[in-house]
């Protein structure tokens, strides 16, 4: 059973609240879950302490069992100092080739 720690949406229309849950990855986003680990309210100010509440002992226990956090939960855990988030691989894109650079320089000179 591949377990993932992710956000499950709750709340009403236009006023989302998310539960941080440990769930089987095959279950729907808002469907059945194994255990609730905390909650997240994105509408609160970022400096408010109640914006994100996590039971860190439960989260650490699930990580020890092999649960994988989702991207957003991985950001939360990195900010809390629980698990270091791996940096994204952002390859260098759209670097002009040498010939194009030479053509651009020649065009700029003339």
Curated annotation (Swiss-Prot):
It holds the Pfam family Ribosomal_S16. One of its GO terms (cellular component) is small ribosomal subunit. The keyword Isomerase does not apply. It comes from the Bacteria. The keyword Calcium does not apply. Signal peptide: none annotated. Keywords: Ribonucleoprotein, Ribosomal protein. This is Small ribosomal subunit protein bS16. It comes from Nitrobacter winogradskyi (strain ATCC 25391 / DSM 10237 / CIP 104748 / NCIMB 11846 / Nb-255).
